[in-house]
A protein has these predicted regions:
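Solvent-exposed loop/turn and edge beta-strand elements of beta-rich ligand-binding domains
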Residues: 1-263
């Protein structure tokens, strides 16, 4: 018969706790450990494929402990609200830990670094719990993925006749994505100006009709949004197209423009 009170503290990961005194006995209990897998998606499309020349690769996620007691991860103890591990996504936008990284308990995934071409704004944290040994908690479905907004910008310009400095109206320019090949046409107004900005012409007005300067422009498969730029993060080729207005003039050679900053 064991009498008296035995008090001990387990501070290291292991299978065996030994209580010593006038009597000695051992208790063996293995800690439940699991892992987590998360998916990065495009906010506008909901897809696991990026827009333009952006990428979902190398998104950084911090895994934070929400446990009142310290947890042991890779040989180190972490307190509540401390980052226990940072993981990064692969080319498919998936990041995963091993199946035994995290001990039993509650954790949170927070995006700490956005991938190239995306904003960190709007990326919501995801909470999850480790309850089964050797199981990787799957957060790759649409309901649990973490979403990012693609950077979007606009292009504007002025068409002037060489030698005359006269501004040319109704001149079409084709804008083509170097990554996807998607292309749309913008047309200069009476002052020889063109722009893809919603302040110039709503993205929603005759979207991509390309007939007049008042037709809106929008690249991508998501619904046009006047609060955003028309062109996703990418490199674009601008080509002047032949028309009556530029008849007799040599066309401007095609040139490239990079959209890399939001708005």
């Amino acid at each position: 018969q064991i009498k008296g009170l035995y008090v001990t503290q387990i501070t290291e990961d292991g299978d065996l706790a030994v209580l010593s005194g006038s009597n000695q006995f051992s208790v063996s209990d293995k800690v439940i450990r699991g892992g987590v897998k998360i998916q990065k998606r495009d906010l506008e499309t909901g897809d696991t494929k990026p827009q333009g020349s952006a990428t979902l690769k190398d998104t950084a996620f911090d895994i934070i402990s929400l446990n009142d007691n310290s947890v042991l991860v890779e040989g180190k103890l972490y307190k509540k609200n401390e980052v226990v591990k940072t993981i990064r996504t692969d080319i498919e936008g998936i990041a995963s830990t091993s199946s035994d990284l995290l001990p039993y308990g509650k954790f949170r995934i927070v995006e700490s670094e956005a991938p190239d071409g995306y904003l960190t704004d709007g990326a919501k944290p995801i909470d999850f719990t480790i309850t089964e040994n050797g199981k990787i908690v799957d957060l790759t479905d649409e309901a649990h993925s973490i979403y990012n907004q693609i950077k979007r910008g606009d292009i504007e310009g002025v068409k002037i006749g060489a030698g005359t400095h006269k501004r040319l109206a109704d001149v079409p320019f084709r804008i083509t994505s170097k990554t996807t090949g998607e292309n749309h046409v913008v047309v200069t107004d009476d002052n020889g100006q063109f722009s893809t900005s919603a302040d110039w012409a709503s993205h929603k007005h005759n979207t991509n009709a390309g007939k007049t300067s008042e037709d809106g422009v929008w690249f991508g498969t998501s619904e046009p949004d006047d609060s955003k730029g028309a062109l996703p993060y990418d490199t674009y080729i601008i080509e002047e197209m032949r028309c009556d207005s530029n008849k007799g003039f040599e066309l401007i050679p095609p040139f490239e423009i990079v959209v890399s900053r939001n708005n």
